[in-house]
Swiss-Prot record:
InterPro entries: CitD (IPR006495), Mal_deCO2ase/Cit_lyase_ACP (IPR023439)
Coiled coil: none
Subcellular localization: Cytoplasm
Taxonomic source organism: Rhodopseudomonas palustris (strain BisA53)
Gene name for this UniProt entry: citD
Keyword annotations of the record: Cytoplasm, Phosphoprotein
The keyword Phosphoprotein is annotated on this UniProt entry: yes
Record protein name field: Citrate lyase acyl carrier protein
Length: 97
């Protein structure tokens, strides 16, 4: 899938996160801002990158503003942002399980 427009998913409420995704031509860039970055930053980034990889996203700018979200919330917000940023949303649901 190719990111064709900017999109948002999530909130800045406690235990949630806001994902901003936009087109980028030269690879994947992930920017993480988190209240718990020193404890969980690498893990949050891994969950987000795994989700992006499973959906075939190789070129995008992804900015995550985390407020202590669980893994399932990170994955859900990344998937939702992607679904809003592509022209045709036909994911392989088995790859997301």
């Amino acid at each position: 899938m190719k990111i064709v427009r900017g999109a948002l998913a999530g909130t800045l409420e406690s235990s949630d996160l806001l994902v901003r995704i936009s087109p980028k031509e030269d690879g994947l860039e992930l920017v993480l801002n988190s209240e718990v970055i020193h404890q969980f930053g690498p893990h949050i980034e891994k969950v987000a990158r795994d989700c992006l990889a499973r959906l075939g996203i190789t070129e995008a700018l992804v900015v995550i503003e985390d407020k202590g979200a669980l893994d399932c919330v990170v994955a859900a917000r990344v998937q939702t942002a992607i679904s809003r940023a592509v022209d045709e949303w036909n994911p392989d649901w088995s790859a997301l399980s």
